[in-house]
Swiss-Prot record:
Job of this protein: Binds 16S rRNA, required for the assembly of 30S particles and may also be responsible for determining the conformation of the 16S rRNA at the A site.
GO molecular function: rRNA binding; structural constituent of ribosome
Gene Ontology terms: cellular component: cytoplasm; small ribosomal subunit
SUPFAM superfamilies in the record: Glucocorticoid receptor-like (DNA-binding domain) (SSF57716)
Listed Gene3D superfamilies: 1.10.287.1480
TM segment ranges: none
UniProt cross-references to HAMAP family, sorted A to Z: Ribosomal_uS14_1 (MF_00537)
Name by which UniProt lists this protein: Small ribosomal subunit protein uS14
Subunit record text: Part of the 30S ribosomal subunit. Contacts proteins S3 and S10.
Gene that specifies this protein: rpsN
Pfam families xref list: Ribosomal_S14 (PF00253)
Keyword annotations of the record: Ribonucleoprotein, Ribosomal protein, RNA-binding, rRNA-binding
Family note: Belongs to the universal ribosomal protein uS14 family.
Highest taxon listed in the record's lineage: Bacteria
């Protein structure tokens, strides 16, 4: 199990990314716009740097909903490989069965 503080940190990062998504997209559009003046682009870079680091979506980490485990995460289920296997063995995931050939 991951520490509660780690789970809370991830929740905070998701909230910040949602809050600043439009602002970040607007600034990045100005930065990548070739028609914008150099000064305008530089100001956009400086403004982007003032935003919180955790507002960047690339700082988010997928974690298991049950345990908070960051590795072995399966997006389809939102769980780690261990919890997916446990749920599959109990028959809690419809349509999922153990491979046999």
């Amino acid at each position: 199990m991951a520490k509660q503080s780690m789970k809370a940190r991830e929740v905070k990062r998701v909230a910040l990314a949602d809050k600043y998504f439009a602002k970040r997209a607007e600034l990045k559009a100005i930065i990548s716009d070739v028609n914008a003046s150099d000064e305008e682009r530089w100001n956009a870079v400086l403004k982007l740097q003032t935003l919180p680091r955790d507002s960047s979506p690339s700082r988010q980490r997928n974690r298991c909903r049950q345990t908070g485990r960051p590795h072995g995460f399966l997006r389809k289920f939102g769980l780690s490989r261990i919890k997916v296997r446990e749920a599959a063995m109990r028959g809690e995931i419809p349509g999922l069965k153990k491979a046999s050939w």
